[in-house]
């Protein structure tokens, strides 16, 4: 993107997506060579030296912990990512079949470790036994357990818990623990797959270096910071948004950077200026993405984050709320007026490795009315049990045409080699905004439906005086041809979808068109429209990776691609 876009208008140029097959072939070949090297004796020797001497820093991860969950693990019930194992007090989960792949990933990430050590000395002793169980089976390189999907978070958790564990460990157990941390931290910096997580791997390696006492920790810190600094400017945009365009990814990165900043301070190392700058920017963006119900907006593979977790991420920041109405680099606009708040996606999806969790949902929005989140998306995330179909256009509150989507994730060999990149998405998205005392206008236009010869324009007006939101969704032909309307008539069904939050309910009025929506506060809102047909259909909403039943309002019509069509609608408070 050339230059800094103005706050009142966002323009993202098209970017090419060619050569995906060749990229996949090269990535698969490189991955094979990498796996052979990682499993070799010379590599094992390389990451084993120099031998660590002990422990130094005790990094503090600001993420909230759940001692009650740790107590359940202590009693023999291991519950992770929607799966559960009954282990008994001394069972070994690493020698037992996991109930799902998601469970196995969380298990090997040591996602259970923070909650378990939060219980106290008994939890730390149980954690040491579990780590010993893991080491016995997976202590040497393994493509799954030592892969980027598991290793990064495991090193992070081990680094933060190491000194707490050491307090309950024998000398031999401490020696094993620091050796594990040194080998895995060094290995992190050699991984080239999953390049979208390079920054997070550098942070975890830096934490490991800070925790390792004496000279063995210093080279790891130096190497991690060398990898970290250029990645910070690439992954943290000028407005604080994450380069993946996921608000939740920004919050999780903020947690990681705060943890590293704390560890560097304990080690007596100054934090790089880029690290401090990234923390400030991420904090500002986090505040921008908080909606009126206190939760984070959910876009591009990020789930809704609750108030307690947000408060923990911002506890360091005493600057207070920023009055921002747009995130121009990230591609989002926020509209606030009366009791209605809207946040809209005004940018194209990320491309390449950054798009592995992106969604083909241009111009999607979320709407909060009187602090009730009424309109949202399915909230798919990589932790979700749902299929990648939830990344398509009809899984968000935007327009969908026929059975198509404004982009699609890779599948098959390409996805295996590269990851489930999003391809064929909107390449050009423009947004224009105008604010005055009467309200806010926002126009969004994108070419995500160019394969059907159409552009989608979403025009929104938030009337602060009438306390209502008016919208118009129109589909227009890409190339205007006066003679096209005289040709054969071809119609495509299209719909404007309003996905309801699971706590919201809707009913169609007697006129068959108007829809009454109520949230937890029981305040009613009318959605009036000029669609040909209106339906309330089933939907789903993901919360912590688990699907909850929800509904969606579907405004239906038809469009001739040579002519275009539109649906107008209005959201206004019900009387009484």
Swiss-Prot record:
Keywords: Cell cycle, Cell division, Cell inner membrane, Cell membrane, Cytoplasm, Membrane. GO terms for molecular function: lyase activity. The lineage of its organism: Bacteria, Pseudomonadati, Pseudomonadota, Alphaproteobacteria, Caulobacterales. This is FtsZ-localized protein C. The keyword Nucleus does not apply. Membrane anchor for FtsZ. Binds and recruits FtsZ polymers to membranes early in the cell cycle. May also improve the efficiency of cytokinesis through the regulation of cell wall hydrolysis. GO terms for cellular component: cytoplasm; plasma membrane. It is found in: Cytoplasm; Cell inner membrane. Disruption phenotype: Deletion mutant grows with normal rates, morphology and Z-ring organization. In cells lacking other non-essential division genes implicated in cell wall hydrolysis, such as dipM, ftsE or amiC, deletion of fzlC causes synthetic cytokinesis defects. The keyword Cell membrane applies. One of its GO terms (biological process) is cell division. Interacts with FtsZ filaments.
